[in-house]
Amino acid sequence: KGYRNAVKQFIEASTPIGLFVDSDLPPKDKYLWFDKLINNENPEKTIVIPEGRKDSVFFMIQEMEAWFLKQPFCLDKWAQKEGYTKKETTNIAEHSILKNKNIEEISKPSEKLKIIMKRFFVKNKKAAKYGKLKTAPELLDALNVTALISLDDELRRFYLFVNKPVPR
């Protein structure tokens, strides 16, 4: 389990570092992630993050696809760059999957993104398909990171941690 090794390195680091992990939990339950470090069958394998270090653990509340859903304009930028045309004039943000929804609460954002891309974009009579390795890098480039930080509480917390002044 890669995250367990990352946690061990985080704990053993001599300088203050942050740890950004997938929580796969709703925002209100993010601290339940620490329970994954408890090993009831082999208690000696339990990992304990000291209380003073827990504030330096940051959670990816959702899959990164939630970021794209938070900023649907990045889909338009991607489509234009990749030669896709928009099938309908409806604003993507008005689609029932997104309208009036807290993106951090949407279940399986990668699946929702696939639906949105297939519904809205076409090239050579073929609907757009989302693939994490093929499509995500271009979509990441199209994000407005500054605006995204204000839409994602954990990302903002991480940004402030990374950009805090270093004591001299």
Language-model features, listed with the residues they occupy:
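C-terminal accessory helical subdomains adjacent to catalytic cores in phosphodiester-
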Residues: Y3-G18, S23-R168
